[in-house]
Amino acid sequence: MNVRRLPIPTAVVAAAAALGLGALSACSSGGAAAGDTDKFDVVASFYPMAFLAEQIGGEHVHVTSLTQPGQEPHDLELSTQQIVRLQESDAALHLKGLQPSVDEAIAQSEVGTKIDAATLTSLEDHEDEHGHEDGHEDEHGHEHEHEGGKDPHVWLDPVKYAEVAEGVGKAFEKADPDHAADYRKNTEALVGKLHDLDAAFETGLKNRKTDVFITTHSAFGYLAERYGLIEEAISGLSPESEPSGARVKELTRTAEADGVTTVFYETLVSDRTAKTLADDAGLKTDVLDPIEGITDGSRGDDYFQVMESNLKSLQTALGAK
């Protein structure tokens, strides 16, 4: 669509040349040039943002995700080609605090429309297993901190995700007014589906035997808060942080005291820690997907299908009738 096309900074051009990238019209995963289409070109940071852009934009948008399927988004480092792609886009959609390299690239870019999903709903502090705000080292000694200690995983709460969707829809309407009516209609339809999903979780998790569930990664704080559950995470908000031996023993006692049957792991991170804890405590394992990306191993083809699978897994684990 090329709503606003600005010159690419000299530093980016030089870096691209140094890497032998040639022409600067970077191709998206779909094969079309991000800055060279007749549509509203949106670069999204990772799957939950790309899904919103696609659902709201419909036929009027061309969406490129910076995080590829199967790639762990927390540790994403952008290539020069991706930075060029971002620079040539009409809009950038991200969730500040989740991917530092993306936040920095968007802040430094001259993209006409910058949409930070973290400003479209309220973010909260969800403490880690030691009672501290997030800030963990993984097994490689890398520190992972989220913006202001806030938990960014808002898309796992359908109500908060709907709030973000409404904000994205308004931003699209403002940036591409020729298609505002369609963006508004698509946003309303998406928000309606998210409210239906919320109702399904509310109903489906009633009459449960326990409120407690154990996960490898503290991604489900908003979901737990929404439906009155208690998430006990083996690790903190960083999916790669390693738990202490004391934490593993504490979770074993918690599982026995609260009637926990299952240790949940996720699709993009190793299940080794979950299975070790489950074996020690005599528990089962199952998938609870934080939907940071869709892969061939996902239990569904899109956000709604995977969330429905998550609901079924929780119902089984919590003994919901």
Question: What residue ranges belong to the model's regions?
Answer:
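Extracytoplasmic metal-acquisition and chelation regions
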Residues: N2-K321
